[in-house]
């Protein structure tokens, strides 16, 4: 039995010819269909305001993914909030930290990132313990990070800024 059509649960790449699935489709003469199963969407401004979190009252933002970065800055733009230059950003990986360049001027003294491990990430946050943190999360999320930060008794506000939906 040979497969003639293959479903890939990712969005269609910008350049299909550079996709690894293109070579497979040419080699095995199969048709490739791209359809993402889950799409992450930022919460509305009304839902964000119902959380009663003042963005400008914080001095540092903790990001764990690119989608939370997009959602955070989208909410700031929608609420007409100008994020101050003095805001510090703590990211779980370097990829997320570099993604911040899309929204802010990248300066090493205000952007910190871990190597992706949980312990390194917590150590990085402890280094900046005098800051007032805002943890940007998507729903659902793993409870380890908020629980660990609560045990450390840091000044912390949790905000839920994105949630998954099923595309039509």
Model-derived segments and spans:
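Conserved beta-alpha
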Residues: 1-162, 166
